[in-house]
Amino acid sequence: MKYMTSGDIHRMFKQEDEGTIIRRNNVRRIALENGIKNTLTQNIILIDSKDFFDKVNPYNLQEHEYKIPKLRCIKDCAREWNKHRKTGDRFIHADEIRDFLKTDSTVFKYKFGNKWIVNYDQLLPHLKRINRRE
């Protein structure tokens, strides 16, 4: 029985998946709601790691059999492209992506409140084509 803090468990998940939804508060809530062994010491919740991973991963899966799509808003798509662009590639503005998505039906997009949620993996080949046009 090895006890870990919620921050340690969060860092483990973040190391495997940068965009994970597991946060320190989520870890605490999961532990408290699912009856996972935990101890409170000096305002720190220590969680039994083996019990936690048994509850979170009951079938002991080691690998993903699927690829989780990168869902981003349009502004984040532009930011991610511009952050990871290669030398010689041009900056792409969010308005260019917005104009492209108005006429495109191949990229998954979903209006959520005031923002469009876009599948970045499907958008990436189109961004490469937009990059070649000047």
PLM features: residue spans?
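Major-groove DNA-recognition helix of helix-turn-helix-type DNA-binding domains
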Residues: E16-L46, H84-I117
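Generic alpha-helical hydrophobic packing signal
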Residues: Y3, L46, F52, L71, ...
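A short, Lys/Arg-enriched interface patch at domain edges and termini
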Residues: Q42, K50-K70, Y120-E134
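Extended, non-core accessory segments
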Residues: M1-K2, G7, R11, D76, ...
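Polyanion-binding surface elements
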Residues: M1-N26, E63-E96
